[in-house]
Amino acid sequence: AASDVYKRQIWGVIDMVPITNFPDIRSRCAVHSRESGSMMVIPRENDLCRLYIQLKEVAREDGEGSDVNAAKAKGRIDRSKITPESIIKQAKEIIQPFDLDITDISWFTGYQIGQRVATGFHRNNRVFISGDACHTHSPKAGQGMNVSMQDTYNLGFKLALVCKGLAKQDILQTYQLERKKVAHDLINFDHKFSRLFSGKPMIPNAEKLEGSKDAGGVDLDEFHQVYVQGAKFASGTISDYQDSIMVKKTGAKPRSGEEADGDFNPLANNVPVGRRLFSDLVLGHIDYKMVHLADKMPSDGRFRVLIFPGDVHQYKANWNTLNKFNDVLEAKDSFIKRYTPVNAFPSSVIEILTIHASLRFDIEFHDFPQFTRSTDFKGRTDYWRIFCGAGKAYDGTDIDIYKTFGIDKQAGAILVVRPDSHVAQVVEYSLDGLKQVDEYFSGFMLDQRNNVLPEKDKTINDAIRFLQPRLAV
């Protein structure tokens, strides 16, 4: 079941080649008219253009024989009455005083804005729905496909962990917990965007014009701000997941601001816990190649533990702590070993990345403790898990991910990042912090020490392993 949230509006959409003197026809833009409604212009491939047009008058069905109360009350729109001619007729009125004609129509349709959210996203953690089955809204801001893919991405990695026997079924309950809130946020945004898009524009100083009735129109500056915010929302970068077994916000404090909104732990003052981790440039310690951190965390179902030990060359205590981590993480009962099947690649469930703040030439690669540069069944070293987070690249580019994340180069920090790139936890860089990471995983992961995979054949050339799925293999 789904609940209607807001009043429906009627829109027409048409893909065609425009013939017009409107100067912004090849720019994505919104056109507000004083009396004739609104229109959105979206340039497409080649010379095609899509117009979303607010329709003022559309015939409705009588609703007889319908079991739907809304249809009985006022009837659904009669889609057969929405034609290219009726859509363009309205567009011409909206775009005045510019001229508009069309040719090469490739597609058109009409729709009602029905803003709804399903009452539940699953049944007994056995049947799940996502995307349009969960939430419907206007298509104008581009959020539909993006939010739907984020639904399935959120659900997908959790199903993979459960189906592979790596995690408890409890994590499936967090799908509705996390995504239903996003759906309601989506509807609230869509309602505001649709209201601003559909309303009459505010006429500056209208109250001073004799006989004017337009003083209460849409503020176009506000519309632009919502438009920009919509891009962030549609991309998923501001989806904020609340505290649960998969998100631990202990130590994080809420903060509001145009560019900083969320729950932040002072150990990583610019990293909102529960949101997607922002990426920045780092330098590979072994090869000094400049790379985005996100490119080293592909979407393959694995968790990442990002250790920021600070400047381990300048602060010897930080270096000593990093070496103490080795005894903990190399032990048979460490969270790395407990939750990775026997004979699987060492980092195939939880991958540890070390991002220090020292100059690359101050520390040799093989001086780092073993857990940071593990070897596989053939003795091959994993070179791509140690990075320099501060310094200069060969081309002179300044690198400082510590500044980007708000991490002190003496205090350091540890971040746990989920397979969907959302930050699950921020803790101090210490043995106590490492224990908190262990407790986080013990809340939902299943012990794999009795899950023995077949031994790998050392005689086979397995270079394809870099292209194959990496989760628990």
Spans of model-derived segments:
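A glycine-rich dinucleotide-binding beta-alpha-beta segment and adjacent secondary-structure elements
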Residues: P97-A118, Q370-F371, F377-C388
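Short FAD-binding loop at a beta-strand-to-alpha-helix junction that anchors the flavin cofactor
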Residues: H122-P139
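Short, small-residue-biased leader/transition segments that mark boundaries at the very start
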Residues: A2-Y6
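Active-site substrate-recognition segment that forms the wall
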Residues: I10, I14, R26-N69, H122-N125, ...
